[in-house]
Amino acid sequence: MKIILKYIISLKILLWACIAIYPQSYPFRSISVAEGLQDLIVNALYKDSLGYIWIGTASSLERFDGVHLKSFPIPEEGKRKDVNTIIEMPGHELWMGNRTGLWKVNGEKLLRVAADTIRSGVYSLCSDGKGTLYIGSESGLFIYNSKGVERILLDPNVLSGANFIMGM
């Protein structure tokens, strides 16, 4: 009798456990060219403090508000435009790095930043939360703040692969 009772209790516990781990159904919606996405190659995603989802594609930066897409085309003609990284700085400033350099979202358009200093692809961005932006690029680490842009080489040979920073 005790064995049967233990068996019944064990069976009930297993049934309750199965019900508890039953897969949840989450609403999922895909976004494609039909919804206004400029390119199907997505390299970077970022959710900002206002709730927008920023999508970095092979040809533009897109802002998704949950319903509509707003495209921010990259104005460089004939160049590889791949968006590699996106970050938000204090004050809701959105920055992105691509194969041509560093960009800032300025209202409804993209503004190239430090084009004379950062002339190579930007692959990673990191903020200290106080207004300093660390930029990992094909040609070293750059530090951007209110004083300007400073370049830091990890290897004195500018062509060295050690200066190619993909992530931080």
Label for each model-derived stretch:
Residues M1-M168:
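Carboxylate-rich, polar loop motifs that coordinate divalent cations or form catalytic acidic clusters
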